[in-house]
């Protein structure tokens, strides 16, 4: 739990960006009495007079970070390398060879080549092991994942030579791959969950999210979709514009989606244009404690405009807007310049103490310990945080995330301590990869269609036994039979979903997992009863 919380708090996807020139309207005052002058003199003195050699770059970067840490939890500085990685995840593409992979025992195992990507074009297959890149061994040499990715990626049009080991073939295979633009998808999956109801899960809000979303919507409409479950669970946010585009699809012309306002930044409103394709039909939005930022904008807009019902648990509570300020070396500062407000006037930013990032990162852990994730009765808001939706005048709250209309507790029967430990040690995923490596060809032949797989495939007991045995070997065991039984129900569903992902894609993964999801099942119940 703590690892995921810290990761979420630090993730770049928590940021909402203003699309404005980085240095626009910035004023620089280096007069004799300016605090900036003092900072400049200190840096010059240290660089020229300090007793030992000084890393000037690091000194300045640490100084910037130190200043930002005193402001708020979301004003941050990233190096050029970190900024480049962030932009790739949000801009929708990067240059590379186009494979989904996992590391298995210090070897890169191809899960799936990207459809129509450079690796698929030359014949690289799921299950292939890449052992060398341009004659440099990457298998069995303790090379970091980051270093391997650096070697595989490169400018579009450049070539990279790969050495591959393929199951059933004794000799090594050699491929020359021409790098190309590889899309980074932000829609995790979509499918018809019931005859008239579609399901779309958005993982983050990037430059291509709206295009991906409309592709899914149009395909689902052709299959008879009238209602939609929009899954924003674990969505850390992203681009403000993408959130506005998605919300626009559901709302009437002139409906307020969100507005922003800061000390210097004037009030800026974003209204629906009235050209959306989802203005009719029932909508349910799924959220949890890891739903943040741009995802909360969409959720708040649909809730405040009484366009959709929100199901799940209280969202993260990130209501600050960052403006990117680029530095000449490619690094970037993201400075909080405004708050954002939902249509009813809610600022859903949760409280924070300036300069105390650790306390902020522990807030979700406090919810967990306080019992909020299991009971809505443990959540209390001051009357000053009470607001009302714009059409039906239902009570909603600000100041700490978005409260769902229907609360669904975290399922402790599924997420046992035993299962968390197995996952933490990578025992489940590692043995799933080994199983697929040995059985991929047979499974694809036996189940050419996902519907057959979903209806008839059962995870073999031998795979379960292998996982339990490996856990025991690493001193990971259930505390009693009851915990084991609860774990096995979820573990079987998880393994079936992972195998489906390997054979097909993420949409099939979620089709399996959603059969076990209490949040999804509650949404379906509400749709049937409304």
Residue ranges and their predicted role:
Residues 23-35, 39-56, 79, 109-112, ...:
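Cleft-lining beta-strand/loop regions that shape enzyme active-site pockets
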Residues 54-71:
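An acidic helix/loop motif centered on a single conserved Asp/Glu
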Residues 347-348, 352-530:
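Conserved functional hotspot residues or short segments at active or partner-binding sites
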Residues 311-341, 354-368, 374-381:
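Flexible, acidic/glycine-enriched loop-and-adjacent beta/alpha segments
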Residues 1-32:
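Bacterial Sec-dependent N-terminal signal peptides
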Residues 131-132, 258, 309, 334, ...:
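Hydrophobic beta-strand signal
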Residues 62, 74-112:
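PDZ/PDZ-like peptide-tail recognition elements
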Residues 127-129:
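Structural motif
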């Amino acid at each position: 739990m703590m690892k995921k919380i810290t990761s979420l708090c630090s993730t770049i996807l928590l940021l909402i960006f203003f699309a404005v020139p980085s240095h626009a309207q910035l004023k620089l005052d280096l007069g004799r009495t300016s605090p900036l002058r003092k900072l400049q003199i200190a840096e010059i003195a240290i660089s020229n007079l300090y007793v030992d050699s000084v890393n000037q770059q690091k000194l300045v970067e640490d100084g910037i970070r130190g200043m930002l840490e005193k402001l708020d939890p979301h004003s941050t500085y990233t190096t050029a390398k970190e900024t480049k990685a962030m932009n790739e995840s949000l801009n929708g593409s990067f240059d590379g060879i186009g494979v989904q992979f996992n590391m298995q025992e210090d070897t890169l195992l191809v899960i799936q080549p990207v459809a129509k990507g450079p690796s698929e074009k030359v014949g690289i297959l799921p299950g292939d092991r890449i052992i060398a890149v341009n004659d440099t061994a990457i298998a069995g040499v303790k090379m970091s994942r980051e270093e391997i990715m650096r070697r595989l990626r490169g400018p579009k049009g450049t070539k990279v030579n790969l050495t591959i080991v393929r199951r059933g073939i004794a000799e090594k295979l050699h491929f020359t791959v021409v790098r190309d633009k590889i899309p980074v998808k932000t829609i995790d999956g979509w499918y018809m969950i019931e005859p008239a109801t579609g399901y779309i899960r958005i993982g983050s809000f990037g430059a291509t999210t709206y295009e991906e979303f409309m592709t899914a919507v149009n395909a689902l409409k052709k299959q008879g979709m009238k209602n939609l479950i929009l899954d924003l669970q674990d969505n850390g946010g992203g681009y403000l514009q993408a959130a506005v585009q998605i919300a626009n699809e559901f709302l009437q012309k002139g409906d307020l989606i969100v507005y922003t306002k800061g000390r210097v930044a004037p009030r800026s409103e974003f209204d629906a244009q009235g050209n959306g394709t989802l203005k009719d039909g029932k909508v349910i939005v799924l959220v949890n404690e890891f739903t943040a930022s741009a995802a909360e904008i969409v959720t708040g807009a649909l809730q405040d405009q009484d366009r959709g019902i929100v199901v799940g648990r209280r969202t993260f509570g990130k209501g600050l807007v960052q403006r990117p300020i680029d530095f000449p070396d490619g690094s970037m500062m993201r400075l909080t310049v405004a708050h954002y407000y939902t249509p009813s006037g809610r600022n859903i930013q949760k409280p924070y103490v300036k300069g105390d990032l650790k306390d902020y990162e522990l807030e979700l852990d406090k919810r967990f310990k306080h019992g909020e994730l299991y009971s809505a009765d443990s959540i209390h808001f001051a009357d000053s945080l009470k607001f009302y939706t714009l059409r039906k005048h239902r009570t909603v709250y600000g100041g700490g995330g978005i409260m769902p209309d229907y609360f669904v507790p975290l399922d402790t029967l599924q997420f046992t301590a035993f299962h968390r430990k197995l996952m933490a040690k990578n025992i489940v995923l590692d043995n799933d990869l080994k199983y697929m490596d040995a059985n991929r060809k047979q499974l694809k032949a036996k189940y050419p269609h996902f519907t057959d797989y979903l209806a008839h495939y059962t995870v073999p007991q031998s795979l379960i036994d292998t996982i339990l045995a490996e856990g025991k070997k690493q001193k990971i065991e259930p505390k009693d039979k009851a915990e084991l039984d609860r774990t096995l129900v979820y573990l079987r569903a998880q393994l079936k979903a992972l195998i489906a992902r390997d054979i097909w894609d993420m949409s099939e993964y979620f089709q399996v997992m959603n059969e076990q999801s209490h949040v999804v099942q509650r949404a379906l119940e509400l749709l049937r009863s409304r």
